[in-house]
A protein has these predicted regions:
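S-adenosylmethionine
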Residues: 363, 370-480, 484-486
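Non-catalytic nucleic-acid substrate-recognition regions in nucleic-acid-modifying enzymes
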Residues: 2-271
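SAM-dependent Rossmann-like transferase core, predominantly class I methyltransferases
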Residues: 288-324
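Hydrophobic residues embedded in beta-strands of well-ordered beta-sheets
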Residues: 60, 286-287
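Conserved S-adenosyl-L-methionine
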Residues: 311-405, 410
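Core SAM-dependent methyltransferase catalytic element
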Residues: 480-504
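Short, charged/polar, Gly/Pro-enriched secondary-structure boundary elements
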Residues: 67-74, 296-299, 496-498
Length: 504
């Protein structure tokens, strides 16, 4: 990956949206590698749009009206979003490096920038409005008046720390009274009764913006004066290249393409404090030019307290969707770590009951604090009453779970890889014991398990030892932090699991 930027004088930004026009966009989304089909199914289900899976793994493309941008940002399976300017499925690169780079420069003025920039501008305005709404309702009436012992208002950091400690001690019974410590990632909505209202408001905002004369592009920041907003936009070009038959590097492509963008728009380049990020994605002979719609990955939406191996929320969603949760299902993550899987499950499948557990007290504490943050997201706007989530966390031993035999519908967990946590040697004893205990608590015939591991050899051996309890139904190959891992979907057989001594 490479980025390029340059300097330029003032110039025009993207033009206004035409009044009454129905603006459409082709959206590109990066998704966890291996879960492209899962993401496509979510897009079809929630947006009614068919998706095309890119030959470059980890990307999908779909067309939506621009007014649907709020729903696009609420997709659970996507990491980053961008609007496609143009796509070339079989771009012919010149063998000579100078000629190939010159072609990329000449490409800039031939691209249809107008509508994608309108979509970018609309996306920017929606982010600003959402930020203003969140700031306006970030504190409950009760917490606004709360003072400390010295008569002065408590600082936000101190309030947040106390709230998290209280919530971690009693997740089920304590309501967090403090204000929201971090803003939600753009486009996200809490899973409570107010979500529909917020969605309606965002839809109206989007429709108004599409139909309004919004003027030239503005800078994505708060406290900007009208004079500052009228200044030239700042930009950078990011090049992602894959393939060994190119005569140029990613840096060279980004540099020359960025120079042409700068000359075409007369924008000013800034590598860090930019308004527009132009994407140049090259995969062998496939070239896609786009404009980024997300500033940071949406996979960070749920976690505020990270552990050594925190699972991405988007990958957690893909694992949960793989096991097809049904209403009233009991879903257990026996090695929850920071709680990424059960928190994602509670947010997206609130009609199920989720149980998280871990043998490490620090992991349990992190999970409890992350649940506390989720409760604050769900806090009612007009009172300090928090809406609960169908989720509990407990410290336990994975090989001796305090759950009744056959009482669980689904087990979903990220097993120790033996890299940062545990060891490859310990996995040879841990994996078979885990599978046996998971088989005991799962309902015979209908129970499912979705397990992520990079220690594939050890898992295959362990599964062969418990083949009378678990049957492998599907394997999804994924990339986790550069490691080639696998997600296994197992189905519980009708075979009765070995009973053990009662826990009580």
């Amino acid at each position: 990956m490479a980025e390029a930027a340059g300097d330029a004088g003032p110039g025009p930004g993207p033009g206004p949206a035409q009044e009454g026009a129905e603006l459409a966009a082709v959206i590109g989304a990066t998704v966890p590698t291996g879960f492209e089909q899962t993401a496509a199914e979510e897009v079809q289900e929630k947006l009614g749009s068919a998706s095309r899976i890119s030959r470059d793994r980890g990307k999908i493309y779909f067309a939506v009206p621009a007014r649907s941008l709020p729903q696009v940002h609420r997709l659970r399976s996507v990491d980053n979003l961008f609007v496609v300017v143009e796509e070339f499925k079989d771009y012919q690169f010149k063998e000579n490096k100078e000629d190939a780079l010159k072609d990329l420069e000449d490409l800039v003025k031939k691209l249809p920038w107008t509508d994608p920039l309108k979509v970018w501008e609309l996306n920017n305005s929606l982010k600003k409005k959402k930020t203003k709404r969140k700031k306006h309702s970030s504190q409950s009436p009760a917490s606004r008046e709360k003072l400390n012992d010295g008569g002065e208002e408590r600082g936000a950091d101190q309030k947040d720390t106390n709230d998290q400690e209280d919530c971690a001690q009693n997740i089920a019974g304590v309501e967090p009274a403090g204000s929201q410590d971090t803003e939600k990632p753009q486009g996200m909505a809490s899973q409570n009764g107010g979500e529909e209202d917020e969605e309606d408001n965002e839809q109206l905002d989007a429709r108004d913006e599409v139909q309004a004369n919004s003027g030239s592009g503005t800078k994505a920041g708060d406290g900007q004066t009208a004079e500052e907003e009228a200044k030239v936009l700042k930009f950078r070009v990011t090049c992602n290249r894959a393939g060994d038959k190119h005569s140029f590097t990613s840096n060279e492509a980004a540099r020359d393409f960025g120079g042409a963008v700068q000359e075409h728009f007369q924008w000013k380049a800034d590598m860090t404090n930019f308004d527009v990020e132009v994407l140049l994605n090259i995969h062998n002979n496939e070239v896609v030019v786009g404009i980024a719609l997300t500033e940071e990955s949406l996979h960070r939406r749920n976690i505020t307290h990270f552990g050594p191996t925190t699972l991405r929320s988007t990958l957690a969603y893909g694992m949960l969707r793989l096991c097809d949760p049904q209403p009233t299902d009991i879903i257990v993550d026996p090695m929850c770590g920071t709680g990424a899987i059960p928190i994602e499950g509670a947010a997206e499948w609130p009609c199920c009951y989720h149980i998280a557990g871990d043998n490490n007290p620090q992991a349990v504490k992190r999970a409890a604090n992350n649940i506390c943050s989720l409760l604050r997201k769900n806090e009612s706007k007009d009172s300090s009453t928090a809406l609960g989530v169908p989720l509990d966390v407990i410290q336990w031993d994975i090989c001796n779970l305090p759950l009744r035999t056959g009482s669980v519908d689904i087990v979903v967990t990220d097993m120790p890889f033996g890299k940062r946590i545990g060891s490859k040697k310990k996995n040879w004893d841990l994996y078979p014991a885990c599978l046996m205990e998971m088989g005991r608590i799962c309902t015979p015939g209908t129970g499912r398990a979705v397990l992520l591991t990079q220690d594939k050899k050890c898992f295959a051996k362990a599964l062969s030892r418990v083949g009378h309890i678990w049957r492998r139904a599907q394997t999804v190959w994924v990339n986790v932090g550069g490691l080639h891992a696998a997600v296994y979907l197992l189905r519980r057989t009708w075979e009765r699991a070995e009973e053990r001594r009662p826990f009580w």
